[in-house]
Amino acid sequence: MQKRRIITVNPSASIEMSQYENNEVPYSSVGADEVPSSPPKATDKIRKVSMLPLVFLIFYEVSGGPFGVEDSVNAAGPLLALLGFVIFPFIWSIPEALITAEMGTMYPENGGYVVWVSSALGPFWGFQQGWMKWLSGVIDNALYPVLFLDYLKSGVPALGSGLPRVASILVLTILLTYLNYRGLTIVGWVAVLMGVFSILPFAVMGLISIPQLEPSRWLVMDLGNVNWNLYLNTLFWNLNYWDSISTLAGEVENPNHTLPKALFYGVILVACSYIFPLLAGIGAIPLEREKWTDGYFSDVAKALGGAWLRWWVQAAAATSNMGMFIAEMSSDSFQLLGMAERGMLPEFFAKRSRYGTPLLGILFSASGVVLLSWLSFQEIVAAENLLYCVGMILEFIAFVRMRMKHPAASRPYKIPIGTTGSILMCIPPTILICAVVALSSLKVAAVSIVMMIIGFLIHPLLNHMDRKRWVKFSISSDLPDLQQQTREYEETLIR
């Protein structure tokens, strides 16, 4: 896009650490103790998200509870399923959460990972990151109204197909979209209530299971009968998306301190929400591996506690889908707002409603959900996973590049490892991504490539629209300037 005049809040607080070469955007940040005095902004009146709601927003961005982890037992047996949910967080979840904590506090704004990649690799790749992540988020979100109705159709068969199902999906999407419109703080506290309701039945189930536990059932393993594709995809599906919360960093109360702590608590909450239900279900019920598919926890609940506990688990599953929907939509819509504030999207995407929410971003995300809700998701969801993988590779590269090029930059939270440690930390999750990609089908890879090519075409189209002034692009004056050239700091580093 053409060069624009950028007005920063405080030029002295925005510092570059390298020359603006080719398409690279130099690092610039306002540190925790460098916040300049400025006139009150419109967004200052908007209530910020505090610790507890943020933890549960992270919980729903990543997990929502143990619904869907049953396939891990079906694919690999009890021992590998349990080991997977113990070991996998150290390979994937913790590195992703740590990178999100460091980069999210380095750039505490709603662009999140888009800004990280733009700063390290340039605006073209930053836009591609935004396109792939937003698209994968919308595809992901289109599943939840459908899954919600799938949990209810056993009690209300009319919701299984036809006009009642279509109408229900539309009404549910509108209601949850309106909740997002009313404000992120409301969404956060609703997520807390939904989260407590979704977790409690498994706590009850765990207590009831104690007298019937047989630890030997946890140790069953058959390496000759493992579906590695299903196993890895189940682990990956249930333990990713930690970076999604970064697109809400601008709405968080004191993000430099709140975000890292919330991610820490979120990792513990998510891991416990998987491991303890698996321990209870595997240890208290005789193993019938073929039955461990989506929804089997409701059968476990009935066997252990009766019909009332089964209904509670089913209601918790339905509630969990609503929680994941509102959390994902918040992340997707604020990402579009953050990209518009950085001049990557037309200015009208940065407009907020009277509740402080990105109205157009919400409408765009909701429209994508409604359009995709009528499709068959088996292949397209796998394609969404591949888009997410490519986006994560860009994030790892951006993280390492910033550590190498700007080691002395202000980082309110910094992972206590050096540059070599940063590279080593990214190797295991990168290998895992390669494994997921290698196990995917050619059809899925083809769909993913088509989606990426669309992103490659949209970026120059937006550049053309900007040059022709068909729509207005601008960079928010409330944000630090990522392109300001100040050699003094770099010279200080050299000395």
Swiss-Prot record:
Gene3D superfamilies: Amino acid/polyamine transporter I
GO cellular component: chloroplast; plasma membrane
Keywords: Cell membrane, Membrane, Symport, Transmembrane, Transmembrane helix, Transport
Record protein name field: Probable polyamine transporter At1g31830
Family according to the record: Belongs to the amino acid-polyamine-organocation (APC) superfamily. Polyamine:cation symporter (PHS) (TC 2.A.3.12) family.
The protein's role, per its UniProt record: Probable cell membrane polyamine/proton symporter involved in the polyamine uptake in cells.
Molecular function terms from GO: polyamine transmembrane transporter activity; symporter activity
Entry annotated with the keyword Calcium: no
Main location: membrane
Transmembrane segments: 49-69, 79-99, 112-132, 156-176, 186-206, 230-250, 267-287, 357-377, 380-400, 417-437, 442-462
Source species of the chain: Arabidopsis thaliana (Mouse-ear cress)
PANTHER family recorded: AMINO ACID TRANSPORTER (PTHR45826:SF2), POLYAMINE TRANSPORTER PUT1 (PTHR45826)
Subcellular localization, as worded in the UniProt entry: Cell membrane
Membrane topology: Multi-pass membrane protein
One example of a Gene Ontology biological process annotation: polyamine transport
Taxonomy, superkingdom: Eukaryota
